[in-house]
Amino acid sequence: MKLLAMTVLLVTICSLDGALVRRQAEEPDLQGLFSQYFQTVTSYGKDLLQKTKPQDLQAQVQSYFEKTQEQLVPLVKKAGTELFNMLSNMIELKKTQPATA
C-alpha cells in the first residue's frame, strides 16, 4: 500500500512540475514574429521583382496591347458601321410611314 501511495505521489509531483515548467516558459514575442514575417514578405517581393525583370514585363505588356488593338479596331469599326446603318434604316422607315392620326 505504501508503494502505491509513493507511486501516486511521485506521478502527481512530476505532472505538477511539468505544468509549472510549461507556465514559466516564455511566450513567443508577437512583435518579433510580425517583423520576421514582414522581412520574409519583403525579401520574397525583391526576389520576385528581380526574376521578372521590368523591361521584359513591359515589352510583353506592350506586345499584348498591340495584338489586342489590332484585333479590336476592325471589330469596333464594323460595329460602328452596322449601328449607323441600322439607325439610318430606322429613320428612313419613320419617314416613309404615313402619319396616322
UniProtKB/Swiss-Prot annotation:
Monomer. Interacts with NAXE and NDRG1. The keyword Transmembrane does not apply. The gene is Apoa2. Residues 1-18 form the signal peptide. The modification Pyrrolidone carboxylic acid is found at residue 24. GO terms for molecular function: apolipoprotein receptor binding; cholesterol binding; cholesterol transfer activity; enzyme binding; heat shock protein binding; high-density lipoprotein particle binding; high-density lipoprotein particle receptor binding; lipase inhibitor activity. It comes from the Eukaryota. SUPFAM superfamilies: Apolipoprotein A-II. The lineage of its organism: Eukaryota, Metazoa, Chordata, Craniata, Vertebrata. May stabilize HDL (high density lipoprotein) structure by its association with lipids, and affect the HDL metabolism. Keywords: Cleavage on pair of basic residues, HDL, Lipid transport, Oxidation, Phosphoprotein, Pyrrolidone carboxylic acid, Secreted, Signal, Transport. It is found in: Secreted. Coiled coil: none annotated. GO terms for biological process: cellular response to lipoprotein particle stimulus; cholesterol efflux; cholesterol homeostasis; cholesterol metabolic process; diacylglycerol catabolic process; high-density lipoprotein particle assembly; high-density lipoprotein particle clearance; high-density lipoprotein particle remodeling. This is Apolipoprotein A-II.
